[in-house]
């Protein structure tokens, strides 16, 4: 398998996980929905955090969120996302169970578009050189919420979740050789219909937290000496967390033997720190896409990848930039040879950092670590209880997912890894 397959680990037969931090008896929750103030539509992936702490989460695809607090003190809650003016609201003002958070678009002035145009390759080269200045030089332990879902057509056929720890070595070396992931607890819920059984297994799962951290892992997108292998273009800048961002689109101009990516990268104009990337696997070579992600399939089954996309975002805290959120969507078709029709599947995973310990002496041993070739779905049990994550921060499930869970629970038993 090519280089991409080593780093885009994702496990299919696949399904959902979540992480958080344990809270004291005085814990309380703030919750609500984040919407665009102009069109009233829900805003997804809004970063929501407690000021002065490393605690946070993101809004779900409907804009809904919940954030657990370790005590009842009045702490400011921050809301930020690309293209919108950030907000800071006292937690006491969010005592209602049905809070509506309205965020305004933050337009970029024409003068800013003109002034901050420049050579995209030079900007990227400088940003790569400044990684040791802009990212943690400590050994950090991230607490993360992780979730996987899989749909057959429009119908959910499985979901799995886990609380995970992610050990990160310093960013001055762009290598993930010693970064590791450990599953603390997890659960899964699957359809009991035999026709929904999917024997395809795709590499990855919780190791996305290590493998697609493109700032730390030079093998995901490009290293400095590979910049000439890509075409770059300056796009219209955007604001994120009140800071102007360069937006640079890229696509490969030199084709390799492994799957490659095209997409957009966001770079903080002042710090020249990478803050976000949206990228997809080049769709013109299905063989390379398959080699990058397929771990195992039954004989006679045809696997046809349609789309493989990633979003990776980072958050600026006290002058340093930290990994914050990762999502991966994979669309593919499967059928047995000599069958007339194929089935369409969508596998989706996402994870968010909910807490962080900096400069820690804690380690994850190789024995405890989630291995590159392990399949997450295979190592967590079935269990589904409403209070399972009562003392953890998670990404709230969407309404469609909640309905799917209710239907799946009616079809059979569920298990848990305690």
Model-derived regions, located:
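Bacterial Sec-dependent N-terminal signal peptides
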Residues: 1-33, 48, 110, 418
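Structural motif
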Residues: 29-43
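Short Pro-Gly-centered beta-turn/loop motif in secreted/extracellular proteins
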Residues: 40, 66-74
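Hydrophobic beta-strand segments
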Residues: 46-50, 77, 115
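A short, solvent-exposed loop/turn motif at the edges and junctions
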Residues: 50, 78-89
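Short, acidic Ser/Thr/Gly-rich low-complexity loop/linker segments typical of extracellular
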Residues: 54-64
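Surface-exposed, low-complexity/disordered segments
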Residues: 102-230, 241-244, 293-294, 299-418
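Extended beta-strand-rich segments in extracellular/periplasmic secretory proteins, especially
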Residues: 218-269, 273-280, 315-316
């Amino acid at each position: 398998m090519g280089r991409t397959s080593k780093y885009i680990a994702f496990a299919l037969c696949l399904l959902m996980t979540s992480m958080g931090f344990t809270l004291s008896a005085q814990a309380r929750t703030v919750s609500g929905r984040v919407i665009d103030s102009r069109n009233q539509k829900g805003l997804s992936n809004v970063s929501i955090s407690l000021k002065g702490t490393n605690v946070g989460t993101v809004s779900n695809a409907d804009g809904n969120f919940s954030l657990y607090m370790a005590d009842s003190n009045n702490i400011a809650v921050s809301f930020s996302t690309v293209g919108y003016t950030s907000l800071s609201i006292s937690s006491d003002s969010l005592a209602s169970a049905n809070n509506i958070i309205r965020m305004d678009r933050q337009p970029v002035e024409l003068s800013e578009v003109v002034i901050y145009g420049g050579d995209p390759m030079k900007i990227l080269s400088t940003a790569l050189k400044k990684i040791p200045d802009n990212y943690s030089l400590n050994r950090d332990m991230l607490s993360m919420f992780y979730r996987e879902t899989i749909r057959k057509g429009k119908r959910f056929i499985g979901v799995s979740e886990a609380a995970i720890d992610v050990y990160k070595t310093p960013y001055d070396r762009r290598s993930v050789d010693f970064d590791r992931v450990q599953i603390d607890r997890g659960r899964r819920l699957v359809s009991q219909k035999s026709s929904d059984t999917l024997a395809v297994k795709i590499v990855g799962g919780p190791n996305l937290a290590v493998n697609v951290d493109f700032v730390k892992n030079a093998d995901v997108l490009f290293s400095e000496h590979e910049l000439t292998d890509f075409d770059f273009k300056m796009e219209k800048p955007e604001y994120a967390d009140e800071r102007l961002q360069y937006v640079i689109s890229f696509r490969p101009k030199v084709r390799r033997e492994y799957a490659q990516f095209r997409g957009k990268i966001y770079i903080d104009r002042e710090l020249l720190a990478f803050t976000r990337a949206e990228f997809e696997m080049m769709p013109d070579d299905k063989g390379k896409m398959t080699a990058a992600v397929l771990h195992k399939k039954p004989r006679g089954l045809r696997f046809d990848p349609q789309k493989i996309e990633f979003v990776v975002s980072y958050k600026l805290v006290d002058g340093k930039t930290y990994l914050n959120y990762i999502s991966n969507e994979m669309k593919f078709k499967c059928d047995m040879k000599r069958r007339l029709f194929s089935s369409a599947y969508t596998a989706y995973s996402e994870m968010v950092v909910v807490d962080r310990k900096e400069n820690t002496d804690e380690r994850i041993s190789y024995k405890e670590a989630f291995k590159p070739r392990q399949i997450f779905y295979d190592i967590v049990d079935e269990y589904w209880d409403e209070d399972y994550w009562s003392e953890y921060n998670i990404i709230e499930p969407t309404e469609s997912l909640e309905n799917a869970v209710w239907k799946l629970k009616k079809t059979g038993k569920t298990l848990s890894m305690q």
